[in-house]
Amino acid sequence: MSEGGGLRRARHPPVWLAFFVATSLLATLSLSVSAQVAGDTIPTDSAPRDTLLVPIPPEAVGGDTIPEALRAEAASMAGMAEIPLMPGVGAPGWGSARWEWGPEELARLPGLTVLEFLELLPGMTTFRPGGFGRPIGLTAMGMGGGRVRVILDGFEMDPLGANAFEIETLALLDLESIRVERSLSEIRIEIRTFRMPEPEPFSTVELGTGVFQTRVLRAILARGFGDHSVATGAFDLGSTGGIGIREQYRHSSAVFRWSAAPAPGSGLQLEWRRTAIDRAGTVYPRETARTDLVVRGRQELGDRITTEALVGRAFEEDREAERRLEVTQGALRGIYSAPSFSAEAAIRGRSLGEGGAPLAGSEAEARLAWLPTSSFGLELASRRMAGSDLSAVDSRAMAMMTPIAGFTVFGSGEFGSRLVPRVEHQPALPSGSSGASGELVVADATGWRAGAELAAGASAVGVAAFATGASPSIPFGLPFDGDGVPVVVERSTGLETYLVAGVPRTDGAVRLEGWYTYFPGEAVRPYTPVDLGRAALVFQGVFFEGQLEPILRVEGVRRGRARVFSAAGQPSATAPVSHRLNLSLQIRILDVEAFLFWDNLLADPAAIDLPGAPAGSSRIVYGASWRFRD
């Protein structure tokens, strides 16, 4: 009965869909009526202004009746402060291949996880998707596996038991901003956690449900204590019965963070984070629990320098393989930030516990961005990694020039090598389990990228050519390619473009946006599709002075044919061509938001190509979130 019920819900959209469509129509009608009323002429007041002013003697004014206790509490809350921010180095944009989402942008993105947000960015793609809750690999620009770094408030979320951290398990409501830098040798994801927007207590609750018994529950609560301390707690729970209600999955993420700013420009923070994954069924079952403990301190030195010191420990227990992985990490970094120049220097050290993943024992990194004029910019970066009697250095340089307003040309180059983790611990077949083993691999990190961008108002178009020498190609270290052997590949070239254009006569409310990446020739490099792209039509309106905001997005996604590592460890399998049509609708009224995410509307079976998993089907999730203050 449960299986049949799940399939019936997949074929017939829920009643909520009709509710959302009706709400959108009502919003449109309300807009028309509002515009008509706004156009009417309201007569001005014809009464003469009162010119009589009666002064009130000071002695006639009564004293303030606000109790002293309330006055002290208000003054305390007005002076409440979080720990200092660590500013980013380098401006986001097409030329720098760097993108950043703040709190408002994150609230408007369609998707249930951070991983789904990242797929929206140019060149980003996933491989071996098996549906919500199954293992999945993220890559870009022909890099292969092992090239994703996740840095959470300065603490790098080291992968334990795989080549990349499972970013889809992060608690969404606990994220303040996401900054993504896509070079030709790695994907660097810098995440800033939640900060109180106002002194008053703040909380948000989000509930969602959908087909295949999908459930989403999220919550966050933050409030101040005393003069200069803030406590934040967040919880994120996602579960599903899987396609056909046969592959149950559940993950939970809990976060507690205490921040203290005893003096202006200084702060101390303690953070505890625990993530549990329970993947049942027959397609790569897994039951793990990961805990991260971090202590960080920050200090501003003047108006432009901010320093940070942190130490943290991460350990993971895998009940399927009966192993424990752990790593201890310490880091020091400093950032200088000025309008025309910014620089960052950082060192990081690790102590690997027994059974830990292969990671660099020490790292040193320096980055700078120089903008002497509004028409010229230069960025330089270098990083040294050492571990397991190996070392590698990779460097990058980028220049941008704007000869005329709105037109920018850019070029970047990378050279050197880097250490890439290779883990082969997980079962080659779904029915088995094994212990962890792995090694560090010295991989080439050379390549170049050059192109141009033309921007006018809210519209922009950009093109770029690139070449990557990232070799060897490393598997993701996930169950479907855990026995994969690194493969030496030749240099690959490609072309990419993006477009954002407002639709005429819509006052910017309707826009087209998309991107496309093309690799000429046959799909030879593993995890590198012949082509991939996204195209979307987006409506975003703001009505009644910001009290009503509907967002409707319809997009098509294509991923071309690509070679992938098979369970036998060789890049001999082929991922099929996939076409998906997605729809998302979000309606915010004041502090309440309703959402509907309908992925793979046409049920393309190739949307899921994980070995052993059922064919792709539509996924419908809908729900609402409430934001509370005080």
Predicted regions: what they are:
Residues 592, 615-630:
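Outer-membrane beta-barrel "beta-signal"
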Residues 196-201, 225-229, 263-267, 300-306, ...:
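Short loop/turn motifs that connect adjacent beta-strands in outer-membrane beta-barrel proteins
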Residues 185-190, 196-254, 264-266:
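Outer-membrane beta-barrel translocator/receptor signature
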Residues 419-445, 469-498, 517-534, 559-586, ...:
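Outer-membrane beta-barrel domain signature, especially the mid-to-C-terminal portions
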Residues 240, 245, 265-331, 357, ...:
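Flexible loop and strand-edge segments within Gram-negative outer membrane beta-barrel domains
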Residues 207-211, 237-241, 272-278, 311-317, ...:
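Transmembrane beta-strands of outer-membrane beta-barrel pores
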Residues 57, 67, 71-99, 115-155, ...:
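Extracytoplasmic beta-strand/coil segments of soluble accessory domains associated
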Residues 155-182:
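Short acidic/polar hinge/loop motifs at secondary-structure boundaries
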